[in-house]
């Protein structure tokens, strides 16, 4: 198991211990959810389709009108270096989720850029592949595409959290399926 004191996070050009990773309390990503993100994963220690994820991150940045202080290539290099710093913490059977987040920053400041790795809980979830995962259709609806583009990965996931709480009240371990306002299937709350 990866310990927080052993792993590193990239924050604004520096690689810091996870336990020392902080952002300002007045950051818009914290106070208003004013941030974008993308998530990719590794397979056998290699990041899968990183360039495509970075492209999507920049599409979300454009939608939210946040200017990245880093180029696509700089983020790609930073992500690879972060993985190099953290890969030794995993066994050869383990992999990472890699999260890239860019906040607007505080109202009088610059965007904050965070890249961090989280071990994939593959062993804990192996039972899902054998026996399935309990699901329920939530009464909580996905944010309307008229209010917020579903193509942009933004830090607005409170409806997913509420849907998961509803699913947990339905059955322990259950995940939620969210519909749109017209009753159409949109997506699951995550696993």
How would you label these PLM feature ranges?
Residues 187-191:
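Glycine-rich phosphate/ribose-binding loops and adjacent secondary-structure elements
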